[in-house]
Design a protein with these regions (language model features):
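Internal hydrophobic alpha-helix adjacent to the cofactor/substrate pocket in enzyme cavities
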Residues: 252-261, 363-366, 371-374, 461-478
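Conserved redox-cofactor binding core of oxidoreductases
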Residues: 90-206, 226-228, 275-276, 381-400
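A glycine-rich dinucleotide-binding beta-alpha-beta segment and adjacent secondary-structure elements
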Residues: 187, 369-452
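Glycine-rich FAD pyrophosphate-binding loop
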Residues: 5-27
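Glycine-rich loop(s) and the adjacent beta-strand/alpha-helix scaffold that form part
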Residues: 203-206, 210-279, 283, 465-468
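An anion/pyrophosphate-binding glycine-rich loop and adjacent beta-alpha core
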Residues: 59-71, 252-367
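N-terminal leader/propeptide and maturation segments of large enzyme subunits in energy/redox metabolism
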Residues: 59-122, 130, 328-331, 337-383
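N-terminal glycine-rich dinucleotide-binding loop that anchors FAD/FMN and/or NAD(P) in oxidoreductases
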Residues: 26-62
Protein backbone atom coordinates (compact mmCIF):
# COMPACT_ATOMS: atom_id res chain seq x y z
CA UNK A 1 0.00 0.00 0.00
CA UNK A 2 2.88 2.38 0.72
CA UNK A 3 4.39 1.70 -2.70
CA UNK A 4 1.04 2.28 -4.42
CA UNK A 5 0.51 5.48 -2.44
CA UNK A 6 4.01 6.63 -3.39
CA UNK A 7 2.93 6.17 -7.00
CA UNK A 8 0.14 8.66 -6.41
CA UNK A 9 -2.74 6.20 -6.17
CA UNK A 10 -5.73 6.46 -3.86
CA UNK A 11 -5.72 3.50 -1.48
CA UNK A 12 -8.42 1.97 0.72
CA UNK A 13 -7.47 -0.83 3.13
CA UNK A 14 -10.18 -3.13 4.46
CA UNK A 15 -9.25 -4.78 7.77
CA UNK A 16 -11.51 -7.44 9.28
CA UNK A 17 -10.20 -6.77 12.79
CA UNK A 18 -10.35 -3.68 14.99
CA UNK A 19 -6.64 -3.01 14.53
CA UNK A 20 -3.97 -3.46 11.89
CA UNK A 21 -1.33 -6.15 11.98
CA UNK A 22 -2.91 -9.58 11.78
CA UNK A 23 -0.36 -12.34 12.31
CA UNK A 24 2.47 -9.98 11.39
CA UNK A 25 2.19 -7.95 14.57
CA UNK A 26 2.66 -11.19 16.52
CA UNK A 27 5.95 -12.00 14.82
CA UNK A 28 8.73 -12.17 17.40
CA UNK A 29 11.69 -13.12 15.18
CA UNK A 30 12.97 -10.97 12.36
CA UNK A 31 13.46 -10.73 8.61
CA UNK A 32 15.80 -12.78 6.46
CA UNK A 33 17.93 -10.93 3.92
CA UNK A 34 21.09 -11.87 2.04
CA UNK A 35 24.18 -9.75 1.33
CA UNK A 36 23.43 -6.77 3.54
CA UNK A 37 25.81 -4.23 5.09
CA UNK A 38 24.51 -5.36 8.48
CA UNK A 39 25.81 -8.89 7.88
CA UNK A 40 29.28 -7.55 7.07
CA UNK A 41 29.50 -6.08 10.57
CA UNK A 42 29.67 -9.65 11.92
CA UNK A 43 32.67 -11.97 11.94
CA UNK A 44 32.09 -15.11 9.90
CA UNK A 45 32.09 -18.32 11.91
CA UNK A 46 29.52 -20.41 10.07
CA UNK A 47 31.66 -22.52 7.73
CA UNK A 48 30.15 -25.70 9.15
CA UNK A 49 26.66 -24.46 8.31
CA UNK A 50 27.57 -23.82 4.67
CA UNK A 51 29.29 -27.19 4.33
CA UNK A 52 26.31 -28.95 5.91
CA UNK A 53 23.90 -27.31 3.46
CA UNK A 54 26.01 -28.25 0.45
CA UNK A 55 26.21 -31.83 1.72
CA UNK A 56 22.43 -31.95 2.25
CA UNK A 57 21.84 -30.69 -1.29
CA UNK A 58 24.08 -33.41 -2.71
CA UNK A 59 22.82 -36.24 -0.52
CA UNK A 60 19.08 -35.59 -0.39
CA UNK A 61 18.19 -33.42 -3.40
CA UNK A 62 20.39 -34.72 -6.22
CA UNK A 63 17.28 -35.21 -8.37
CA UNK A 64 16.08 -31.61 -7.92
CA UNK A 65 17.49 -29.53 -10.78
CA UNK A 66 16.92 -26.18 -9.07
CA UNK A 67 18.61 -27.20 -5.83
CA UNK A 68 21.49 -28.86 -7.68
CA UNK A 69 22.10 -25.76 -9.80
CA UNK A 70 21.93 -23.46 -6.78
CA UNK A 71 24.31 -25.70 -4.85
CA UNK A 72 26.82 -25.58 -7.70
CA UNK A 73 26.69 -21.78 -7.73
CA UNK A 74 27.05 -21.58 -3.94
CA UNK A 75 29.95 -24.04 -4.00
CA UNK A 76 31.77 -21.79 -6.48
CA UNK A 77 31.04 -18.72 -4.33
CA UNK A 78 32.17 -20.56 -1.20
CA UNK A 79 35.42 -21.68 -2.79
CA UNK A 80 36.14 -18.10 -3.89
CA UNK A 81 35.37 -16.75 -0.40
CA UNK A 82 37.66 -19.27 1.27
CA UNK A 83 40.47 -18.26 -1.07
CA UNK A 84 39.93 -14.59 -0.20
CA UNK A 85 37.67 -14.18 2.87
CA UNK A 86 36.41 -10.60 2.72
CA UNK A 87 33.37 -9.52 4.73
CA UNK A 88 30.62 -11.91 5.79
CA UNK A 89 29.84 -14.85 3.54
CA UNK A 90 26.30 -15.05 2.20
CA UNK A 91 24.68 -14.80 -1.20
CA UNK A 92 21.28 -14.52 -2.83
CA UNK A 93 21.77 -18.05 -4.13
CA UNK A 94 22.56 -19.41 -0.66
CA UNK A 95 19.35 -17.86 0.68
CA UNK A 96 17.50 -19.46 -2.23
CA UNK A 97 19.19 -22.79 -1.52
CA UNK A 98 18.33 -22.69 2.19
CA UNK A 99 14.72 -21.78 1.37
CA UNK A 100 14.38 -24.54 -1.23
CA UNK A 101 15.93 -27.19 1.03
CA UNK A 102 13.79 -25.99 3.94
CA UNK A 103 10.71 -26.29 1.72
CA UNK A 104 11.74 -29.82 0.71
CA UNK A 105 12.11 -28.71 -2.90
CA UNK A 106 8.38 -28.07 -3.29
CA UNK A 107 8.76 -24.27 -3.53
CA UNK A 108 8.19 -22.31 -6.73
CA UNK A 109 11.80 -21.44 -7.70
CA UNK A 110 10.78 -18.20 -9.43
CA UNK A 111 9.12 -16.90 -6.25
CA UNK A 112 12.06 -17.98 -4.09
CA UNK A 113 14.41 -16.14 -6.45
CA UNK A 114 12.29 -12.98 -6.23
CA UNK A 115 12.23 -13.26 -2.44
CA UNK A 116 16.00 -13.59 -2.10
CA UNK A 117 16.98 -11.10 -4.81
CA UNK A 118 14.82 -8.35 -3.30
CA UNK A 119 15.54 -9.08 0.37
CA UNK A 120 18.53 -6.77 0.92
CA UNK A 121 16.79 -3.89 -0.84
CA UNK A 122 13.75 -4.50 1.36
CA UNK A 123 15.93 -4.01 4.46
CA UNK A 124 17.11 -0.66 3.08
CA UNK A 125 13.55 0.29 2.16
CA UNK A 126 12.35 -0.43 5.69
CA UNK A 127 15.13 1.79 7.04
CA UNK A 128 14.04 4.56 4.66
CA UNK A 129 10.57 4.63 6.21
CA UNK A 130 11.89 4.50 9.77
CA UNK A 131 12.05 0.77 10.52
CA UNK A 132 15.62 -0.34 11.14
CA UNK A 133 16.33 -4.06 11.56
CA UNK A 134 20.08 -4.21 11.93
CA UNK A 135 20.82 -6.85 14.57
CA UNK A 136 21.84 -9.98 12.65
CA UNK A 137 21.43 -13.43 14.16
CA UNK A 138 21.05 -17.13 13.43
CA UNK A 139 17.77 -18.96 12.81
CA UNK A 140 16.82 -22.54 12.09
CA UNK A 141 17.44 -23.79 8.57
CA UNK A 142 19.74 -20.93 7.60
CA UNK A 143 23.33 -21.80 6.76
CA UNK A 144 24.59 -18.45 8.05
CA UNK A 145 23.46 -15.53 10.20
CA UNK A 146 20.79 -13.91 8.05
CA UNK A 147 17.87 -12.84 10.20
CA UNK A 148 17.68 -9.07 10.78
CA UNK A 149 16.05 -7.88 14.00
CA UNK A 150 15.20 -4.56 15.63
CA UNK A 151 16.69 -3.42 18.91
CA UNK A 152 15.18 -1.11 21.52
CA UNK A 153 16.66 2.03 23.06
CA UNK A 154 18.75 -0.14 25.39
CA UNK A 155 20.24 -2.04 22.47
CA UNK A 156 18.31 -5.22 23.27
CA UNK A 157 16.69 -7.36 20.57
CA UNK A 158 12.93 -6.80 20.46
CA UNK A 159 9.96 -8.36 18.66
CA UNK A 160 9.93 -7.50 14.96
CA UNK A 161 6.17 -7.44 14.42
CA UNK A 162 5.27 -5.10 17.25
CA UNK A 163 8.08 -2.84 16.01
CA UNK A 164 7.43 -2.80 12.26
CA UNK A 165 3.63 -2.77 12.05
CA UNK A 166 3.05 0.57 13.84
CA UNK A 167 5.72 2.17 11.63
CA UNK A 168 4.03 0.83 8.50
CA UNK A 169 0.68 2.08 9.77
CA UNK A 170 2.06 5.55 10.49
CA UNK A 171 3.56 5.72 6.99
CA UNK A 172 0.16 4.87 5.54
CA UNK A 173 -1.54 7.53 7.65
CA UNK A 174 1.07 10.07 6.55
CA UNK A 175 0.14 9.23 2.95
CA UNK A 176 -3.59 9.66 3.66
CA UNK A 177 -4.39 6.01 3.06
CA UNK A 178 -7.92 5.22 4.23
CA UNK A 179 -8.50 2.34 6.68
CA UNK A 180 -11.85 0.61 7.14
CA UNK A 181 -11.51 -1.44 10.34
CA UNK A 182 -13.95 -4.15 11.44
CA UNK A 183 -14.82 -4.54 7.77
CA UNK A 184 -14.62 -8.02 6.27
CA UNK A 185 -14.19 -8.37 2.52
CA UNK A 186 -16.23 -11.28 1.17
CA UNK A 187 -16.33 -10.91 -2.61
CA UNK A 188 -14.06 -9.70 -5.39
CA UNK A 189 -16.08 -7.84 -7.99
CA UNK A 190 -15.28 -9.19 -11.44
CA UNK A 191 -16.21 -7.62 -14.79
CA UNK A 192 -15.18 -9.03 -18.15
CA UNK A 193 -12.53 -11.18 -16.47
CA UNK A 194 -11.04 -8.26 -14.54
CA UNK A 195 -11.02 -7.51 -10.80
CA UNK A 196 -12.73 -4.14 -10.40
CA UNK A 197 -13.51 -3.90 -6.70
CA UNK A 198 -14.54 -5.51 -3.43
CA UNK A 199 -17.78 -6.18 -1.59
CA UNK A 200 -17.53 -6.28 2.18
CA UNK A 201 -19.53 -6.26 5.40
CA UNK A 202 -19.04 -3.87 8.30
CA UNK A 203 -19.16 -4.79 11.98
CA UNK A 204 -22.81 -3.78 12.31
CA UNK A 205 -23.77 -5.71 9.18
CA UNK A 206 -23.88 -2.80 6.75
CA UNK A 207 -22.72 -3.50 3.21
CA UNK A 208 -19.63 -1.85 1.75
CA UNK A 209 -18.70 -1.71 -1.93
CA UNK A 210 -15.34 -0.41 -3.11
CA UNK A 211 -14.80 0.10 -6.83
CA UNK A 212 -11.13 -0.05 -7.82
CA UNK A 213 -8.80 -0.42 -10.77
CA UNK A 214 -6.66 -2.91 -8.83
CA UNK A 215 -7.31 -5.26 -5.91
CA UNK A 216 -4.56 -6.65 -3.64
CA UNK A 217 -5.33 -9.60 -1.38
CA UNK A 218 -3.18 -9.60 1.77
CA UNK A 219 -5.53 -11.32 4.19
CA UNK A 220 -3.09 -13.83 5.66
CA UNK A 221 -3.47 -17.59 5.93
CA UNK A 222 -6.00 -19.84 7.64
CA UNK A 223 -4.15 -20.99 10.74
CA UNK A 224 -6.90 -19.72 13.07
CA UNK A 225 -9.60 -21.62 11.16
CA UNK A 226 -9.52 -25.00 12.90
CA UNK A 227 -12.07 -26.50 10.52
CA UNK A 228 -10.07 -25.46 7.46
CA UNK A 229 -6.81 -26.69 9.00
CA UNK A 230 -8.38 -30.06 9.74
CA UNK A 231 -9.82 -30.24 6.21
CA UNK A 232 -6.41 -29.97 4.60
CA UNK A 233 -4.36 -31.73 7.29
CA UNK A 234 -6.56 -33.96 9.50
CA UNK A 235 -3.67 -34.99 11.76
CA UNK A 236 -3.57 -31.43 13.15
CA UNK A 237 -7.02 -31.72 14.71
CA UNK A 238 -6.91 -30.43 18.27
CA UNK A 239 -3.62 -28.54 17.92
CA UNK A 240 -3.44 -25.06 19.44
CA UNK A 241 -2.62 -22.13 17.14
CA UNK A 242 -0.38 -19.08 17.36
CA UNK A 243 -2.52 -17.24 14.80
CA UNK A 244 -4.52 -14.05 15.17
CA UNK A 245 -8.29 -14.41 15.02
CA UNK A 246 -8.48 -12.90 11.54
CA UNK A 247 -6.47 -15.71 9.90
CA UNK A 248 -9.59 -17.47 8.62
CA UNK A 249 -8.69 -18.09 4.97
CA UNK A 250 -11.35 -15.77 3.59
CA UNK A 251 -8.93 -14.25 1.09
CA UNK A 252 -8.28 -17.66 -0.42
CA UNK A 253 -12.02 -18.32 -0.69
CA UNK A 254 -12.62 -14.97 -2.40
CA UNK A 255 -9.77 -15.50 -4.82
CA UNK A 256 -10.86 -18.99 -5.85
CA UNK A 257 -14.40 -17.69 -6.41
CA UNK A 258 -12.83 -15.16 -8.79
CA UNK A 259 -11.04 -17.93 -10.68
CA UNK A 260 -7.70 -18.10 -8.87
CA UNK A 261 -5.72 -21.31 -8.59
CA UNK A 262 -4.32 -22.55 -5.29
CA UNK A 263 -1.27 -24.64 -4.43
CA UNK A 264 0.11 -26.60 -1.45
CA UNK A 265 -3.03 -26.21 0.65
CA UNK A 266 -2.09 -29.24 2.77
CA UNK A 267 1.28 -27.76 3.70
CA UNK A 268 0.66 -26.41 7.20
CA UNK A 269 3.51 -25.62 9.56
CA UNK A 270 3.53 -26.27 13.26
CA UNK A 271 5.97 -24.12 15.22
CA UNK A 272 8.08 -26.15 17.65
CA UNK A 273 8.25 -23.68 20.53
CA UNK A 274 4.88 -22.48 21.77
CA UNK A 275 4.05 -21.94 25.44
CA UNK A 276 0.49 -22.93 26.27
CA UNK A 277 -1.02 -21.64 29.50
CA UNK A 278 -3.49 -23.56 31.63
CA UNK A 279 -6.37 -21.60 30.09
CA UNK A 280 -5.33 -22.79 26.63
CA UNK A 281 -3.87 -19.50 25.41
CA UNK A 282 -0.90 -20.13 23.12
CA UNK A 283 2.14 -17.85 23.05
CA UNK A 284 4.80 -18.09 20.36
CA UNK A 285 8.34 -18.38 21.75
CA UNK A 286 10.72 -16.96 19.18
CA UNK A 287 13.10 -19.19 17.28
CA UNK A 288 15.65 -16.47 17.93
CA UNK A 289 16.32 -17.93 21.37
CA UNK A 290 17.64 -21.14 19.83
CA UNK A 291 19.57 -19.17 17.23
CA UNK A 292 21.16 -17.15 20.03
CA UNK A 293 22.22 -20.22 21.98
CA UNK A 294 19.25 -21.80 23.80
CA UNK A 295 18.85 -25.56 23.92
CA UNK A 296 15.90 -27.95 24.20
CA UNK A 297 15.74 -30.70 26.80
CA UNK A 298 13.10 -33.37 27.36
CA UNK A 299 11.41 -34.68 30.49
CA UNK A 300 14.55 -36.71 31.24
CA UNK A 301 16.68 -33.55 31.23
CA UNK A 302 18.46 -34.54 28.02
CA UNK A 303 18.95 -32.84 24.67
CA UNK A 304 17.29 -34.83 21.89
CA UNK A 305 17.74 -32.96 18.57
CA UNK A 306 19.57 -30.19 16.70
CA UNK A 307 17.71 -27.14 18.00
CA UNK A 308 18.41 -25.00 14.92
CA UNK A 309 17.23 -27.50 12.34
CA UNK A 310 14.11 -26.64 10.31
CA UNK A 311 10.83 -26.17 12.12
CA UNK A 312 9.19 -29.29 10.74
CA UNK A 313 12.03 -31.50 11.99
CA UNK A 314 12.31 -29.87 15.42
CA UNK A 315 8.52 -30.06 15.86
CA UNK A 316 8.52 -33.75 14.91
CA UNK A 317 11.29 -34.42 17.42
CA UNK A 318 9.30 -32.74 20.20
CA UNK A 319 6.09 -34.55 19.29
CA UNK A 320 8.05 -37.82 19.45
CA UNK A 321 8.74 -37.17 23.16
CA UNK A 322 6.44 -39.07 25.55
CA UNK A 323 4.61 -35.91 26.65
CA UNK A 324 4.91 -34.13 23.26
CA UNK A 325 6.67 -31.22 24.98
CA UNK A 326 10.12 -29.97 25.96
CA UNK A 327 11.91 -27.27 27.94
CA UNK A 328 13.71 -24.35 26.29
CA UNK A 329 16.71 -23.35 28.41
CA UNK A 330 18.46 -19.94 28.49
CA UNK A 331 20.80 -18.13 30.87
CA UNK A 332 21.05 -14.61 32.27
CA UNK A 333 23.55 -13.54 29.62
CA UNK A 334 20.90 -14.19 26.97
CA UNK A 335 18.27 -12.35 29.01
CA UNK A 336 20.53 -9.31 29.27
CA UNK A 337 20.64 -9.05 25.47
CA UNK A 338 16.96 -9.62 24.72
CA UNK A 339 13.89 -7.61 25.65
CA UNK A 340 11.87 -10.49 24.20
CA UNK A 341 13.12 -12.98 26.82
CA UNK A 342 12.63 -10.38 29.54
CA UNK A 343 9.03 -10.15 28.38
CA UNK A 344 8.57 -13.90 28.69
CA UNK A 345 9.90 -13.78 32.25
CA UNK A 346 7.60 -10.87 33.13
CA UNK A 347 4.64 -12.75 31.66
CA UNK A 348 5.33 -15.72 33.91
CA UNK A 349 6.25 -18.22 31.21
CA UNK A 350 9.52 -19.27 32.87
CA UNK A 351 10.79 -21.27 35.81
CA UNK A 352 14.19 -20.33 37.20
CA UNK A 353 17.10 -21.53 39.28
CA UNK A 354 20.34 -20.09 40.61
CA UNK A 355 22.12 -23.32 39.63
CA UNK A 356 21.56 -26.08 37.11
CA UNK A 357 20.34 -28.29 39.96
CA UNK A 358 17.81 -25.69 41.12
CA UNK A 359 16.51 -25.17 37.58
CA UNK A 360 16.19 -28.94 37.12
CA UNK A 361 14.14 -29.13 40.31
CA UNK A 362 11.87 -26.32 39.08
CA UNK A 363 11.45 -28.15 35.75
CA UNK A 364 10.78 -31.47 37.44
CA UNK A 365 13.66 -33.29 35.72
CA UNK A 366 16.53 -35.32 37.13
CA UNK A 367 19.13 -32.93 38.56
CA UNK A 368 22.22 -34.99 37.81
CA UNK A 369 21.14 -35.74 34.24
CA UNK A 370 20.29 -32.11 33.50
CA UNK A 371 23.55 -30.86 35.00
CA UNK A 372 25.46 -33.34 32.85
CA UNK A 373 23.50 -32.18 29.79
CA UNK A 374 24.39 -28.54 30.46
CA UNK A 375 28.07 -29.29 31.03
CA UNK A 376 28.25 -31.39 27.86
CA UNK A 377 26.56 -28.63 25.86
CA UNK A 378 28.87 -25.93 27.19
CA UNK A 379 31.86 -28.05 26.22
CA UNK A 380 30.40 -28.45 22.73
CA UNK A 381 30.02 -24.67 22.45
CA UNK A 382 33.63 -24.12 23.47
CA UNK A 383 34.79 -26.72 20.94
CA UNK A 384 32.25 -25.56 18.33
CA UNK A 385 31.44 -29.20 17.72
CA UNK A 386 28.16 -30.91 18.61
CA UNK A 387 29.00 -34.61 18.36
CA UNK A 388 25.56 -35.60 19.68
CA UNK A 389 23.21 -33.97 17.15
CA UNK A 390 25.34 -32.10 14.63
CA UNK A 391 24.27 -28.57 15.51
CA UNK A 392 26.44 -25.99 13.72
CA UNK A 393 25.26 -22.76 15.43
CA UNK A 394 26.58 -22.28 18.97
CA UNK A 395 26.69 -18.65 20.23
CA UNK A 396 27.93 -18.75 23.86
CA UNK A 397 27.93 -21.31 26.68
CA UNK A 398 24.87 -21.28 28.92
CA UNK A 399 26.97 -20.57 31.99
CA UNK A 400 25.71 -17.29 33.48
CA UNK A 401 23.34 -17.68 36.45
CA UNK A 402 20.48 -17.53 37.05
CA UNK A 403 19.03 -19.94 34.52
CA UNK A 404 15.55 -20.02 32.99
CA UNK A 405 13.39 -22.59 31.21
CA UNK A 406 10.11 -22.34 29.31
CA UNK A 407 7.80 -25.34 28.81
CA UNK A 408 6.97 -25.54 25.11
CA UNK A 409 5.00 -27.68 22.67
CA UNK A 410 4.32 -27.42 18.92
CA UNK A 411 1.24 -25.55 17.62
CA UNK A 412 -0.22 -24.55 14.24
CA UNK A 413 1.70 -21.53 13.02
CA UNK A 414 1.86 -20.92 9.25
CA UNK A 415 -0.07 -22.10 6.21
CA UNK A 416 2.36 -22.40 3.30
CA UNK A 417 -0.39 -23.04 0.75
CA UNK A 418 -2.60 -20.45 -0.85
CA UNK A 419 -3.25 -18.43 -3.98
CA UNK A 420 -0.95 -19.01 -6.95
CA UNK A 421 1.01 -15.89 -7.94
CA UNK A 422 3.91 -15.05 -10.23
CA UNK A 423 6.97 -12.92 -9.36
CA UNK A 424 4.96 -9.78 -10.18
CA UNK A 425 2.46 -10.80 -7.46
CA UNK A 426 -0.21 -11.25 -10.13
CA UNK A 427 -2.85 -13.83 -9.20
CA UNK A 428 -2.98 -16.72 -11.66
CA UNK A 429 -5.90 -18.90 -12.76
CA UNK A 430 -5.84 -22.66 -13.28
CA UNK A 431 -4.34 -22.16 -16.75
CA UNK A 432 -1.45 -20.16 -15.32
CA UNK A 433 -2.81 -16.90 -16.75
CA UNK A 434 -2.81 -13.65 -14.78
CA UNK A 435 -6.24 -12.42 -13.65
CA UNK A 436 -6.28 -8.78 -14.68
CA UNK A 437 -6.28 -6.32 -11.80
CA UNK A 438 -5.87 -8.96 -9.08
CA UNK A 439 -2.73 -9.26 -6.92
CA UNK A 440 -1.77 -11.03 -3.71
CA UNK A 441 1.06 -11.02 -1.16
CA UNK A 442 2.05 -12.67 2.08
CA UNK A 443 0.65 -15.77 3.76
CA UNK A 444 -2.48 -15.79 1.60
CA UNK A 445 -0.28 -16.94 -1.29
CA UNK A 446 1.31 -20.32 -1.91
CA UNK A 447 4.52 -21.48 -3.52
CA UNK A 448 7.10 -19.33 -1.77
CA UNK A 449 7.80 -21.67 1.14
CA UNK A 450 7.00 -25.11 -0.25
CA UNK A 451 6.48 -27.78 2.41
CA UNK A 452 8.06 -25.82 5.28
CA UNK A 453 8.79 -22.14 5.95
CA UNK A 454 12.08 -21.00 7.42
CA UNK A 455 11.93 -18.62 10.36
CA UNK A 456 12.51 -15.06 9.13
CA UNK A 457 11.09 -15.73 5.68
CA UNK A 458 7.52 -14.70 6.55
CA UNK A 459 8.50 -11.09 7.23
CA UNK A 460 10.71 -11.15 4.14
CA UNK A 461 7.73 -12.53 2.19
CA UNK A 462 5.24 -9.86 3.18
CA UNK A 463 7.71 -6.99 2.79
CA UNK A 464 9.15 -8.12 -0.56
CA UNK A 465 5.92 -9.24 -2.19
CA UNK A 466 3.93 -6.52 -0.44
CA UNK A 467 6.10 -3.96 -2.20
CA UNK A 468 5.91 -5.82 -5.50
CA UNK A 469 2.12 -6.17 -5.32
CA UNK A 470 1.75 -2.45 -4.58
CA UNK A 471 3.97 -1.53 -7.50
CA UNK A 472 2.14 -3.91 -9.85
CA UNK A 473 -1.28 -2.70 -8.70
CA UNK A 474 -0.23 0.92 -9.21
CA UNK A 475 1.10 0.18 -12.69
CA UNK A 476 -2.19 -1.50 -13.59
CA UNK A 477 -4.16 1.51 -12.35
CA UNK A 478 -2.48 3.96 -14.71
Amino acid sequence: AIEAANAGKKIVILESQAMAGGNSIRSTGGMNAAKTPEQDKNSFDEAAGVEKTLATAAEKFADNETITALAATVKSQWDAYQANPQGYFDSVELMELDTMIGGKGKNNPELVKALAENSADAIEWLASIGAEVKNVGAFGGASVKRIHRPVNADGKVTAVGAYIVPILEKNLQDRNVQFLFDTTANEIIMKDGKAVGIKATGKDGHKVTINAKSVVIATGGFGANAEMVEKYKPELKGFATTNAEGAQGQGIDMATAAGAATVDMNQIQIHPTVHIEEDGNAHLITEGLRGDGAILVNAEGKRFYDEVSTRDKVSAAIIAQPDKSAWLVVDQAMVDKSAVIAGYIKSGYTVTGATYEELAKAMGVDEATFTSTMNTWNQAVEAKSDTEFGRTSFANPLATAPYYAIKITPAVHHTMGGIVINPKAEVLNEKGEAISGLYAAGEVTGGVHGANRLGGNAVADFVVFGRISGQSAADNAK
